[in-house]
Structure formats: C-alpha cells, structure tokens
Amino acid sequence: FDSIGGAENATHIGLTGGEPLLHAQRAVEFVSYAHHRAPQAHIRLYTAGDFLTEDILERLRDAGLSELRLSVKLDVADTPEESRATIDDAVRKMALVKRFIPHAMVEMPVIPGTKAAMELLLCELDAVGAWGINLLEFGYPFNDWGEFSRRGFKAKNPPYPVVYNWDYAGGLPIDESEALALELVQFAMRKGLGL
C-alpha cells in the first residue's frame, strides 16, 4: 500500500487475488491499515466466501470494509441438484455477509446454458437483500480448451467489435455469454429486482 504514491488520496481500494481470507488476519490488517491511511476510500474485498465466519465479518466491518463481493460460479455440466446446492450456498453466504457488510454483492461469470439457474439465483439473492450483482462475460483464459469444448462452448467470433490487445488477462469471450447477460438484466428489470 505504501509503495503506491498518493495512495492516501485513493477513492477506492480492492483486496483480491486468489482468496484473501486464506490469511484472514492479514486481510483484516490490510483493510484496517488502508482505512487508516485513506479514510475516505471505499474498501472492497473479493472472496469465494468459503472462509467467512461471523468473527471474520465483524472484524472486517470494524476495520473499515465498505463492500464485500462474493464469487459464484454455476456450471453448465451441473445437475439441477448441484446447481441448487451452489445457489443455496451463495444465498446462505450472502445472508450472513449482509448482517455485517451492507454493501454485499455477487460477481460471477455468465456461463451459457445456466439461464434457469441464474434467474433463480438472481431472485434469491434479491430476496436476502444483495446490494447488486456484477455479471461478467465468460472468457476462455488460453489454457485447457478441452474442458470448454466438453461443455459445448465456442469462442465468440469475432471476439470484440473493436480489436484491441489480445493479451488481455480475461482471455477470449465465450459465445452467447454476453447475450445471456443482457437477457438476465432484462429478466431482473421485468421482475422488479432491487439488485
């Protein structure tokens, strides 16, 4: 944090990269330090949520955490029961987080073939007060195409309306992900969801 010149003037600070809560105490210390150095900053933490506890959430809140984003991933290869278990787990985690961090949301890739499960997830997250959801275009990260092919995915062609640097960390977009994301936004609007 201190190596970034002018960090005390930051408006937003995010802690991500792997799973920050593998080292929960260090994550709490980082949030506390960042909040002390830049009290005006909106401090966000990204997590899969596997290590969330009331104690950790209380310490993060007290340290100055403004927002928590849960990572959720549905899989087109999942059975309906497996999708249901993923949704239940995400909703349980969101309900727990909301008790401590009001600005709690989900950030997840939109995977073609998961429309029904995604719609259910949106409704259930909204019901427990999720602050929002960040729908990410699903990307191929340039390794192990076999798993993508096995699930029936295809790279979008052309990948982007405007050509830019192909070494973008997200990889190539998967066909139909963007269209499904737009359908999900329309679904949320039709249902009057608050997230």
What is the predicted role of each segment?
Residues 8-23, 37-52, 63-90, 103-112, ...:
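Core AdoMet radical
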